[in-house]
Amino acid sequence: MAEFPEPGTVNPDSDLSNGRAEKPEIDTSAPFESVREAATRFGGFGFWRPSLNKLPDASQENIQEPDIMGLKAQAFELQRELIVKERETLEVLKELEATKATVLKLQQRNEAYEEDTLREEVDSHIKPAGVVLKDLSQAKMNLCKIASIRESVEQLKNKLNEERAALEKTRERLMEKSLKVFSLEEEEVRVRFAKEGQTGEKDLGMLNEVQRLSRQAQEVKKTGENAELEVVKAMAETESTRDKIRTAKIRLVAARKMKEAAREAEAVAIAEIEAVTGSMNVGKAEAVTISAEEYSVLARSARDAEEEARKRVEDAMSRVEEANVSKKDVLKKVDEAAQEIETSKRVLEEAVERVDAANASKIEAEEALRKWRSENGQRRRLSSSVNNTSKFKSRRETTTRLMDVNGLHLTYDVVDGSSSSSTVPVLKPTMSIGQILSKKLLLAEDSDMNVANERRKMSLGQMLAKNSSSDKTVSKRSEGKENEKRTKTRKRKSFGFAKISVLLNKESKNKKKKKKIALNLR
């Protein structure tokens, strides 16, 4: 019987026809149930009949023996190939099982991941009741906070509006009071000038002169500053001209070098021409013949050398001329800058002289003003002492000031006798208690305004004191006078008039403030 391949084996004929390099094909068909089915599938079956009558010849036996050996060898090789293919199939099956296992693992992981994601989504969508209540309570708290913040903002806005209204009212009151103060001061100045007459006109003239001198000093300062700016500009121009001169010198040096190089090139060209002409003369003398082409080449080279030398010389000369022209321009600019510097110096010196003259005239005007004020004050005291009557008299000291019941000053009248002079206390015109109180209230309110104005504004005396060096002595004199006044007030306390001395101190302070206000207005 013929041997049939079992199920799960490989067909060797197909492998041999397709080649050994190809992969084996696995038979996955169902196994045969019977031998007849297998025989019908592979070409049928037949009955075996032994041939006993016919004996084979010796030649036929010899021919069949090698065929059997070859078939055995082929069968052995086929068995080997079968074993190899079976091993390969086993490896492939193992790989398939491994891939199936990995695929199953991946599917399990994917399913677990999908289940986790679904659970998380469900948990996120469906929150517990406690979390929802907490969120609601927090939202309510936030709303309450926002409402309280809005209420506080509205309250602050109302307060700001009230404060603005109060500030506007206080500004209006201050403006009214300042207008009243200015009107009162104007009336006081008018009354003073009406009383003084000619002396007031002189005072106004002196003040106008002082103002004019201060303006002149400011103008001189401005001119000095302008002159300084001009000097700075001139110095900058001189520096720029110096830089230009340096560049011109560098260009001159370069032009000289170019000129020397051109001269050297010209000398080389002349030497070449002489050499060529010498060689030509020698050739003529020796009767050496040169072809026309060589002669034309030599002539062209000589002409080219001459033209190059001429061009170089012309370029060098033009550069030298340009450098000379630029040098002349720079020198002219330097001279102009020097002249401008000299003129600016002269202007500065003139401005300084004007400033010195203005300072000297200003000092003289201030001294004249002080003298006039001191003389005018003495005249006022003398006139008031003659017109008024005496009220109190000091027994211990004749030079001390006395006060009346209302807190007014008592001045002294100097009576010149034949042998000795005596001082008589006289009384200034009295004021009512309401006038005194209103005056004190006005001064207390005006002092707050004047403190701020004194910080921003400067009086004429302070402006003039910056430039004058003689104001230091004046300040020392004023300090001495203030110290004398303090000693006098201390002496008054020894009389036992405690209330009167306090009122006197307050009134002296008020007078100082009035003087400052008058200076600021002037």
From Swiss-Prot:
**Feature: compositional bias, Basic and acidic residues:** 473-486
Q: Which UniProt keywords apply?
A: Coiled coil
Q: What is this protein called?
A: WEB family protein At2g38370
Annotated S-S bridges: none
Coiled coil segments of this chain: 77-264, 299-376
Cited InterPro entries = Web
State the family it belongs to. Answer: Belongs to the WEB family.
Region Disordered, residue ranges? 1-32, 374-397, 458-493
Where are the membrane-spanning stretches? Answer: none
